[in-house]
Each structure stands twice: as structure tokens, then as C-alpha cells.
């Protein structure tokens, strides 16, 4: 710690910080542009000037840039010194000479760091009356709009995109006061994290194009704290709504998980919530048609049919909340509850959970991944299956440069010096996958092989680290030399990290990862292990347990069950569509509860219109076992009284109560959570994931809307001049209104939107943190459900045999895509242009055998259908395999590991 003196007052600060960071952490306001907590200091904008004095007696002082000055013990500075204030105002005036006076039409208006800093410096009058510099804007793809004339040359964008996210297609061109930030030519930004430019840019150069299509100001949107639903990582988000539509998603700061950044799937993939074809009212089949029901009719009709059924089974979902899955389990009984995922996937999920709970290895939070000094990724294409983890791995690899700089006593925030000292030095990263990955550019070595051979590599590494681990026979000398390099790197690391998961489709890959981690722990390393699952609540569903989807289908096929309730699950993604349809056709009652229109609704007798994550509350459990709560953003019935969309748990409990002819006793979310805790002790921690509905600050609920929210009384005037009452939230501590507490200093961790007096942009998160870039002042939201066990597991011993190609037979290797593999985000219209066209990848040798070239269309039979796809040649794919894009149209993820036997050139 260090003692500094600011304008005559004494403060205790972190001596490792610079003065800007230290003062902001104290709650003092210093304007800045080029500095960012995640990017460090370069001193480019000269905006953060303060007066520094030699000692208490010095009255003259000198101007210094606070972001480039260490917060040393005994430092004396003044923020309010007149010369410093005039200097800061003049810097803004210089920046404004070329900045357009277009705030009323700029999409950043009201959410703009430049506006905030201009007001903070007191610059309110323009003296410049000459021609402004102008630029041509670029088309940067479907996600981001480009308005280069607003640029103030702070360099944040390229520092984030190139230095932090390792993007290669955004740069700065020109010199002096005429520089251009963009691509060499028009085109879509290639980085999976390009959307963060929207929040990194302090002006309106980079803005959210998906928001532009249905634009409104930040102060006119309704927000709620939420969790990204697009993968298993559980990033914290702030969705904004207006007129019953999600308009944008912003990053919600969580110092333990995603801190400042999201991936593009999480930021832009929300379009499925706004689809017009979503089920909005319950419907029941009458012949070939469906008739619309109200809620009471739906409950009575379903109850009447279920009473006549001899056995009702429930099929849950990894994309439904803990509460919804539990409500289904209560409706049908624990013995009749099935997870809705394939047997193989369920086995892998249970194994991953076993490793996390009983393996004796620490599982780091997302932010902690950045602190590891050697990383082995086994079997996961992390950028496509858990993108935010990939960004964290990139920071971990860059830790080598920080380590080298620290040895020379260079401060952690001196990023230019760190990059200069590091000269692209990296901590070791080793990756295995069926083909190339997006982490190959920073990897020390990438092993491209079938999953069995990837697992064998992992087992061999574990054995080399610890002789008591099972040995692997038949390792080739060339591969053994690579194993020796990996072993040396992992054994020499202080904090090695092993990353694996369920997406490779192999139990042995997960077992190999666990063995490597155990072997490293035995050598005294501070080892961590991270498992990546497939869906937002895969881990929660795994903890809850239940039978596999195949077992559920068997119950229907044999007639042992004659009614089935399917919860938020397109079963065609998890099993053969022919088998699913045949099994559902045998059931006299098929009830579907979902917020999306899925293929199985064609077999449904009753459809209950569920609420999406934006219209409901619930709990999900991420890949590290962290329970996190998401909250309802808006009530769709407020805008259309005909809409009947309820949380799935509310539908299912209402049906359960109707069946038993009793009053509904889960009248609010807390009641469901209490029931979960009572029945499933391992989920007891979810109660602490967020405060209950009685939480108040000074007697007030928390506001979902900024206090400047406008137009509420006119919002429905085209429907009726009689203003309805605002929706009443009985489930949570939030209110659907601007009337409520939104103080940044209030004792809360669940923050719907970032705003503080004088800070309207995302930089307002500074005001919510215990120190800038650290944790939230009153703790990061969420709670871990299990910690590292004391004992650990024995070594896994089932080393697989080598992959052997078979003539006339090809094994399907899984290829995942950030844009296209996820069930929900692939429905977003804006994603259509970023999704690859379906393809089949072939090794050059296999392509030659078949007599086909790149672009040739080949066909194969699957599930009773003939599938025809264009060929793409993949040098890294081992012969005897074909690669298919998992999760895309007609290519269910359950196909991974299956075999094709009739692959041939398609008939023209």
C-alpha cells in the first residue's frame, strides 16, 4: 500500500497502480480516453493530466499524465489545480476540432464516454470554425457500424483488437492528425470478439449495427441483470428492451467471470427472442389444426388428459433453468424424469462433473484462467465451444511478457514497455483437435488427430509426468519427442492448466485430461482443470440427474409410457429424427413447453408458450459449477394482452397443482428455489446466487429503468389512451419502473445497467468496483456449488486403441462454429450471413479415392435421408474421417462419432 495526497487529503492506495487508476478507485473523477483497465497505459490522449508536487511545501508543481505516473508512497498531486483543469479542457478542445457536432444523431449519444469527459472538463463552447477532416466509412460486417469521422485517435480499438484479442484485420493507417482506424479494405471483422469494440471505443466510431435497426437511447431501455444463454461459460450480460423487443446486449461486469468482454455470439445472438413465429399462446391440436387456448383452458385440458394416462414421463433440457427442470421432475416424478440429452453426451457430462467434484483439482473461474503459465487443451476447439475461455487463454499466454517485465521491475500497467520487453514471448500452449483451431496462431504445437489419438497423447503425457499413471503402447518416436517437450513445459510451470470438455465426443479425452492434472498435482504444481460443456445449464442438469433421451424414447416405443412432456428441447438435435418422430407418434399425449418453434411441435398435441430468458427468472450453472441468476427484462403481456407466455416452471407447477386439485403453492421464484434446495442438497447453494424477493435498499426495490426513462405513458397510446398499470414483479427485488434504487454506491451486486452521476457510458462500471478492474464493491454475483475435494480420483486406466481407418467407412469428426452450432443463436437473422454454408470436410487422400475435388457435391445417407453437401479439403483431418459442422441445419450434434458407409459423388 502507498499513501498519496490529493488536493490536500491523504489516501491509502495500491502502490502498484498508476495515479489514474488509484484516483478512480477512490471515487475521484479524472477524465481519460486512451486508458482502459484491461488494456493498461500508453499516455496517448494526454487527457488525464494532474499537477504533481515534489512535497507538501512545493507550490509550483508540474503537469503529469496520471495514467503514466506510479502511485508511489508520498506522492502529492492536485486534480483541481487551475492549470491542470485548463490543460484538460484544452485537450478536449483539440479533439473536438475534427469531431462532428452530431450528438443528436449519433448512436453513442447518452452512452458516450466522450460526452461524459467533455462535460467533466467543462468544455462547452466551440471556437474552431474551419474545415473538419473527413473520412470514408467502411462496411465491417453485420455486427458493427463504422463512422470514422467521430474518431479522436485514442488508439483503444487497435490496442484491444490487435494486442488483447490478437485480431489481425484491424489497424491504424496514416500519420499525425490524419489517421484512420479500420481494415485494409471493406469486409467483415474476423475476430470472434469484435463486438467489444462497441464498448471499448469511447466515441461513436464503432456502434452496434444490430441495435441500429431498432434504435433507441440507453436511457429509454429497460434492463435486468442476466446470464448469456449461448454456451456453458455463463458470462454476465445486461439485455436492454423497448416496446417488447430486445434491442441490444451489453457486457455486465463481473470481476470473477467475464469482466469487461463478451464474445460475438453472446453479444449479437439474441435475435431469437424477437422472432415473430414464437409460440405466444397455448395451442391444442384439433385434427390437423391448432386452436388457441387461454391459460386456464390449457391447464384443464392438459390435466384431463394426464389423469387418463397410465405413465407420464418428462424430458428436460440443458438450455432450461434449474427451476424449470425441477418443476418438470416434480410433475412426473424423479423416476420418470429424463435429461433430454443423448446417452453418450450424458456419460461425458457425468464424468466431467465427477472430475470437477471429486478429482481434487482446482477449477478456476474464467478470470483466473488468465493467471496460468502453461495450458494444455485436449479435444476442445475452445474458440467455437466456449469462446470467452479462448480469450482468457490468450491473456494467459501473454503472461510471459508480463513475467519478463516484472523481473525488470516494470509495472503491470506499463503495457508499451511490457510488449517491448516481451517481443511476442509466450507461455506454452498446446492444443489437440481433429483439425485446425483458432488458437493455433498462439500455440507452441497443435496436434491434429482423431479423438482416440488425442486421448492417447493425453494418457502418454500423464504417464511421462508420473510413472504410476497408465502407460501407452505404440507411441511413434516423432510423437514421443513432442510429448517430451509438452511434459517439460507442464512440469516446469508453476500454474499449469488443463482444458477439456464434452464436445469432442470422447470419454477417454476427459479421462486423459484428468490424468494429466492428477500427475501434475502429484509433482506439487498449482494445477487447474477446466471442463467445457455444451449448453448454458448442462452442469445444472447433470447435477440434477435423470435418464438419457434414448431411455425416454424406449419408454414411449414400448408403450410403458403413454404421455410425455418435453421441456425446451428440440429432440432432433439429440437423437435420430426418425426415431424421435416414431416414438412421439406412439404417445396419445405429447406436450411441448418451449419459447421457440421446433420440429417436434409437429407431433405435439398441446403446446405451452414459454418465456425466454429475457421474459423469465431462473438459475443456471456454468462450466465451473457457478450458480448464477438471470432476471426478467420485461413482461411481454404488457404490450399485448393476448400474449400468454409464462416461465416454464410456472406452467409446469400450475399443471401439477391442477392435476392434484390443489392451490398453486409456488407463487414466486423463491418458493421454487426453496423446493429445489429441500429435494436436492447439492443445489443448496443456488439460494445464495442472488438475494430473494424481499431484498430492499432503504425500503426500495431496484429499478430496471434509468431515471431518465421517457415515453412510458405514451408507449401504448396507439392501442388505448388508458394507461395500464406497470407490471408487478413478485419474483425478484426488481421493479418494472424507473422508480426504485439505482445508486452505484448501494449495497448490491445485481446491477441491471451501469450508470453513475457524470458517467453514462460503460466506463461507469468504475463506480461499482472495489478497485478499478477488480471485483464489484459488494462482491461478484454468483456462487460456486462445489470446491476442490481433499482426496482425488484414481488414475483412469482405459487407454483407447489407435484410430484405424476402414475401407469404405468414414467416421464423423465434429467441427463446431461460433456462428451456427448453437441451437438458439443460429435462429438470429443477423447470424445467417456469418454462418458457413453446410459442408463436408475430406482429407486429400480420401478425396482422391472418391475422385472428388473442393466444391464437388457428395452425398450420404443418414437417418433415412440422403444428405448432399459440397466438399472442402482439410489437410489436417486424418484420413478415414469426414468433418461435419455440428448443430447446423440437418446435422445434429449427436452425429459426432457416427460412421458413414455410402459416401459418394452426388448425381448431377
Curated annotation (Swiss-Prot):
It is a peripheral membrane protein. Binds 1 [2Fe-2S] cluster per subunit. GO terms for cellular component: cytoplasm; membrane; NADH dehydrogenase complex; plasma membrane; respiratory chain complex I. One of its GO terms (molecular function) is metal ion binding. PANTHER family: NADH-QUINONE OXIDOREDUCTASE SUBUNIT G, RESPIRATORY NITRATE REDUCTASE. Composed of 13 different subunits. Subunits NuoCD, E, F, and G constitute the peripheral sector of the complex. This is NADH-quinone oxidoreductase subunit G. The gene is nuoG.
Amino acid at each position: 500500500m502507498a499513501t498519496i495526497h490529493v488536493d490536500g487529503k491523504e489516501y491509502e492506495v495500491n502502490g502498484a497502480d498508476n495515479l489514474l487508476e488509484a484516483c478512480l478507485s477512490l471515487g475521484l473523477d479524472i477524465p481519460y480516453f486512451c486508458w482502459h483497465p484491461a488494456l493498461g497505459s500508453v499516455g496517448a490522449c494526454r487527457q488525464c493530466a494532474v499537477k504533481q508536487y515534489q512535497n507538501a511545501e512545493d507550490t509550483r508543481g508540474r503537469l503529469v499524465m496520471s495514467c503514466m505516473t506510479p502511485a508511489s508512497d508520498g506522492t502529492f498531486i492536485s486534480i483541481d489545480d487551475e492549470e491542470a483543469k485548463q490543460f484538460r479542457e484544452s485537450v478536449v478542445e483539440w479533439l473536438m476540432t475534427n469531431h462532428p457536432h452530431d450528438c443528436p444523431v449519433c448512436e453513442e449519444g447518452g452512452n458516450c464516454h466522450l460526452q461524459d469527459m467533455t462535460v467533466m472538463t467543462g468544455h462547452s463552447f466551440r471556437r474552431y470554425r474551419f474545415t473538419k477532416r473527413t473520412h470514408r466509412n467502411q462496411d465491417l460486417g453485420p455486427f458493427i457500424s463504422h463512422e470514422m469521422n467521430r474518431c479522436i485517435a485514442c488508439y483503444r480499438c487497435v490496442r484491444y483488437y490487435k494486442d488483447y484479442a490478437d485480431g489481425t484485420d484491424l489497424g491504424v493507417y496514416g500519420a499525425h492528425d490524419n489517421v484512420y482506424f479500420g481494415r485494409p479494405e471493406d469486409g467483415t471483422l474476423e475476430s470472434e470478439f469484435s463486438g467489444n469494440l462497441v464498448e471499448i471505443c469511447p466515441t461513436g466510431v464503432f456502434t452496434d449495427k444490430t441495435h441500429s435497426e431498432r434504435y433507441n437511447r440507453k436511457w429509454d431501455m429497460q434492463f435486468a441483470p442476466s446470464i448469456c444463454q449461448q454456451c456453458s461459460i455463463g458470462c454476465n450480460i445486461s439485455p436492454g428492451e423497448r416496446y417488447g423487443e430486445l434491442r441490444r446486449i451489453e457486457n455486465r461486469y463481473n470481476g470473477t467471470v467475464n469482466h469487461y468482454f463478451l464474445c460475438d455470439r453472446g453479444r449479437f445472438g439474441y435475435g431469437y427472442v424477437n422472432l415473430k413465429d414464437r409460440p405466444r399462446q397455448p395451442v391444442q391440436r384439433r385434427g390437423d389444426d391448432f386452436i388457441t387456448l387461454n391459460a386456464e383452458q390449457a391447464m384443464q385440458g392438459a390435466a384431463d388428459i394426464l389423469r387418463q394416462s397410465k405413465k407420464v414421463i418428462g424430458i428436460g433440457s440443458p438450455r432450461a433453468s434449474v427451476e424449470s427442470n425441477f418443476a418438470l421432475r416434480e410433475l412426473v416424478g424423479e423416476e420418470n424424469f429424463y435429461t433430454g440429452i443423448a446417452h453418450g453426451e450424458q456419460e461425458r457430462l457425468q464424468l466431467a462433473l465427477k472430475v470437477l467434484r471429486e478429482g481434487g483439482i482446482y477449477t478456476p473461474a474464467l478470470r483466473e484462467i488468465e493467471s496460468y503459465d502453461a495450458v494444455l487443451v485436449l479435444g476442445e476447439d475452445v474458440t467455437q465451444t466456449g469462446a470467452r475461455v479462448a480469450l482468457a487463454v490468450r491473456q494467459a499466454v501473454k503472461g510471459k511478457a508480463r513475467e519478463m517485465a516484472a523481473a525488470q521491475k516494470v509495472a503491470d500497467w506499463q503495457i508499451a514497455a511490457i510488449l517491448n520487453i516481451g517481443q511476442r514471448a509466450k507461455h506454452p500452449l498446446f492444443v489437440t483437435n481433429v483439425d485446425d483451431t483458432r488458437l493455433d496462431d498462439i500455440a507452441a504445437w497443435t496436434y491434429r488427430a482423431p479423438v482416440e489419438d488425442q486421448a492417447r497423447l493425453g494418457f502418454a503425457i500423464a504417464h511421462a509426468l508420473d510413472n504410476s499413471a497408465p502407460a501407452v503402447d505404440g507411441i511413434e518416436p516423432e510423437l514421443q519427442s513432442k510429448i517430451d517437450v509438452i511434459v517439460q513445459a507442464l512440469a516446469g510451470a508453476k500454474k499449469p492448466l488443463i482444458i477439456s470438455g464434452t464436445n469432442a465426443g470422447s470419454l477417454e479425452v476427459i479421462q486423459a485430461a484428468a490424468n494429466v492434472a492428477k500427475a501434475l498435482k502429484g509433482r506439487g504444481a498449482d494445477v487447474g482443470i477446466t471442463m467445457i460443456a455444451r449448453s448454458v445449464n448442462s452442469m445444472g442438469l447433470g447435477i440434477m440427474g435423470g435418464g438419457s433421451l434414448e431411455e425416454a424414447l424406449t419408454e414411449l416405443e414400448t408403450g410403458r409410457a403413454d404421455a410425455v412432456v418435453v421441456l425446451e428441447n428440440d429432440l432432433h438435435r439429440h437423437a435420430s429424427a426418425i426415431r424421435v418422430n416414431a416414438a412421439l407418434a406412439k404417445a396419445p399425449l405429447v406436450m411441448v413447453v418451449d419459447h421457440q418453434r421446433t420440429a417436434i411441435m409437429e407431433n405435439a398435441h398441446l403446446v405451452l408458450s414459454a418465456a425466454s430468458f429475457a421474459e423469465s427468472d431462473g438459475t443456471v450453472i456454468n462450466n465451473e459449477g457457478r450458480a448464477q441468476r438471470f432476471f426478467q427484462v420485461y413482461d411481454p403481456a404488457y404490450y399485448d394482452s393476448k400474449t400468454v407466455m409464462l416461465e416454464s416452471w410456472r406452467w409446469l407447477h400450475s399443471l401439477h397443482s391442477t392435476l392434484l386439485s390443489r392451490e398453486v403453492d409456488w407463487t414466486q421464484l423463491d418458493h421454487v428455489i426453496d423446493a429445489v434446495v429441500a429435494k436436492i442438497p447439492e443445489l443448496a447453494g443456488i439460494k445464495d446466487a442472488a438475494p430473494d424477493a424481499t431484498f430492499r435498499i432503504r425500503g426500495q426495490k431496484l429499478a430496471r429503468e434509468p431515471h431518465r426513462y421517457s415515453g412510458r405513458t405514451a408507449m401504448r397510446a396507439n392501442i388505448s389512451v388508458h394507461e395500464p398499470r406497470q407490471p408487478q414483479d413478485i419474483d425478484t427485488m426488481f421493479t418494472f419502473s424507473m422508480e426504485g434504487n439505482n445508486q452505484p454506491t448501494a449495497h448490491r451486486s445485481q446491477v441491471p445497467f451501469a450508470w453513475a452521476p457524470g458517467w453514462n457510458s460503460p466506463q461507469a462500471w468504475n463506480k461499482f468496483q472495489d478497485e478499478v478492474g477488480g471485483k464489484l464493491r459488494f462482491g461478484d454475483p454468483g456462487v460456486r456449488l462445489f470446491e476442490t475435494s481433499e482426496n482425488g480420483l484414481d488414475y483412469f486406466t482405459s487407454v483407447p486403441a489407435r484410430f484405424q481407418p476402414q475401407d469404405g467407412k468414414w467416421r464423423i469428426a465434429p467441427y463446431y462454429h461460433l456462428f451456427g452450432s448453437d441451437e438458439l443463436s443460429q435462429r438470429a437473422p443477423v447470424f445467417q450471413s456469418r454462418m458457413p454454408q453446410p459442408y463436408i470436410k475430406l482429407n486429400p487422400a480420401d478425396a482422391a479415392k472418391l475422385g472428388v475435388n473442393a466444391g464437388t457435391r457428395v452425398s450420404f445417407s443418414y437417418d433415412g435421408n440422403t444428405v448432399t453437401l459440397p466438399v472442402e479439403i482439410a489437410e489436417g483431418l486424418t484420413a478415414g474421417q469426414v468433418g461435419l459442422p455440428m448443430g447446423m441445419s440437418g446435422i445434429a450434434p449427436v452425429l459426432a462419432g457416427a460412421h458413414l458407409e455410402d459416401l459418394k459423388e452426388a448425381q448431377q
